[in-house]
Amino acid sequence: MANRLASLKNRIVLVVIISILVSLFLFVTGEFIGLIVVDSVAGTVLFLLFFIRKRIPSKIDQQLVLLLIHMYSISHGEIKPDDLVKVIAETKDYGYYSEVFSGILKLAKEYGYGITKATSEMAETTKPPFKDVLIRCQQAFSSTNPKGYLELESSTMSEEYSGYYDRAIKSIDMLGGVYSTFSSVAVFIIMILDILVVFTNTPSIVYFGYLVASSVLIVMYVGLKAVVPKDVLIHIDKDLPPQQYTRFKTVLPIACACTVPAALVSIIYGYPYGFLVAGAAFLLPGYYAYKFEMFVVGVNENYPTLIKGLGENMASSSSLQNAISYVLYLELGKLKDLLKRAYARVKIGVDNAKTLTLLSSEAASHTVYMANKMFLDSFSYGADLLEVGKILGNNCVKSLEFSKKREAVAKTIEATTFLLQPITVVLLTVLTFMSKYFNSTLTSVPYFTFGTIPTVVINIGNVFMILLTTILNALTLKEARGGFWGSSLLYIGLLLILSGAAWIGAQAMMNLTFGGAFGNLQQITANIP
């Protein structure tokens, strides 16, 4: 098969060379509009090519670890190499990895390569570490007893992922601090450049200040997002979505519609009051999303007890009904009610696969969904469910440890963010007040010409910066914590309310403290001959 990596690299290099040559020609001939169009098109094409190339994983991730655990679990039963590949190929939740295994199966069945040769061919189209995994899996696929190979491979990859996750958490901690530092520095960049307008008489500096500050914040957020592990917490069954998720989807359009009255309030009463209205609107969907996420986290915390209990009981009886009745006596927290429903279903004759699938849908947990699927596949191939339960339970415990470490780091970033957000708003409000003061007092000095600060631009720029920092801060907190994307709406709502309150408080403080003094100073400077 053609090497996708080499093809993509060649396309990227070709686009870069052509765009540089065409851009130089247009620049020399003075066709600046054409230059902008060509660079925009080239940038879009490069972005799409990089996006396609990014789909080929180049580092260890959660899906790869789960894939190996899945193969190791079902290898405890009577299974052939063809079936090992088929199970992974049919599990579309593995994304790109599932596509590769589908290619292996297609080469082996339709073109007569055989599983081992097909695996070798497909390995050449991937990147490490997945490429290395496929090369080593050739030994497992050529063996009559692949369990030993897969045990070593899954345990090794789990340890590597553990090390990667620890390093990623340290990177999140460091980059979170750097992001917080730059968010405060960005405001001072704007303030210094705006004040320079008075002495340089170049109003265009104001635009440059907001451009630099916003660009720095966006770059820092992208850098943080690049190092964050892409864990999946939520699983949504399209046919049977959980009630908490349905509530969230119901109130989300209402919150989005409330941005219209928030804009009207901003026009009539002022921007800070519009922020308060918009923040209050986003609190409701954010609250439902946060409660939904906490429910899933609670389910995950009790799931290791459930899966180990099911494995212990079904290893001897092979009856899901008896296993669930036994596990119901254990302390399962938020899983208890879900398990009672599962027990009621299995009592009236619902089959095991349907029962556990419905349990996964109601739990809305990706961990529960994948572990239940592995458990069912292992059961269908006659695996030792006692061992399978231990494997899946231990993997869930490791995932919980990772989540708690990540949450501890995220809390530090969260505290810093909620502290810096109002400070940023206060400084921008002071900047607006000082700009108006300079315009009204310093421009009347006869022996020196002072520049006029464009206060209208500053007002719009401040609103833009507050909205940008609010959104980026909320997304940064979401990336640091992981979890459900809807929880970022709660952060947006809280930060908008905090920003509006800080703006109102800063305006009141400036008017109360310096309003009279600045008014008298303005009268004095106006009387200077």
Model-found features: residue ranges?
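Juxtamembrane boundary at the C-terminal end of a transmembrane helix
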Residues: 504-529
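Juxtamembrane helix-loop transition segments at the membrane interface in multi-pass membrane proteins
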Residues: 48-62, 224-247, 293-304, 438-445, ...
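Juxtamembrane/interface alpha-helical elements of multi-pass membrane proteins
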Residues: 30-122, 248-361, 369-378, 383-406, ...
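Short, charged cytosolic
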Residues: 138-159, 380-395
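Short juxtamembrane and helix-loop transition motifs at transmembrane-helix boundaries
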Residues: 1-6, 172-174, 233-244, 450-457
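Hydrophobic alpha-helical transmembrane segments
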Residues: 114-135, 148-164, 221-226, 354-374, ...
